[in-house]
Amino acid sequence: MIDAVPPVAPPDAETIVRWMAANNPVFALLKCEIRHASSGRTCLAMPITPELANTFGAMHGGMIFAFADLCFGFTANAAQNVKGVSSSAEIHWLAPGKVGTTLIGDAKETWREGRNGLYDVYLADEESGEMIAIVHGRMRFIGGDVIPAQSD
């Protein structure tokens, strides 16, 4: 007699985002935190510290871009537990990020088909609500589980 193999439940988006955060050195370096995670949407927060400033005292654009990449990467990988990598992104800087404030990154999956996905990330000052940047990113899914599915 062959024993039946129980079905394997894929991890949910929040579990995947938490796992990615715990295993991502850039997430730790930027002192990010998870505010919300669901399938197709992730919201992260990052304090704007003096170490992230440019020559003129505003948040360095490259740090804003790195944070946005984390936001849409977490969103894409968590939606279906399939590994993906950023293949392109475009950023529109709208206002300077101010040292001493918190930057919020709200990423949303806008389209996904086959091995490709498009994501929008809205980056805003948490206190004032001022929009700091908007990023449009493209993800290429390379296959494989982000984290292995767990048996119930």
Task: Give the ranges of each region predicted by the language model.
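Short, charged/polar surface micro-motifs in flexible loops or helix N-caps
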Residues: 39-40, 49-52, 70, 99
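Short coil/loop residues immediately preceding or within conserved phosphate-binding loops
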Residues: 29, 88, 116-118
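Non-catalytic linker/capping segments at the edges of enzyme domains
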Residues: 1-45, 49, 150-152
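Active-site helix/loop of acyl-thioester processing domains in fatty-acid/polyketide metabolism
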Residues: 62-83
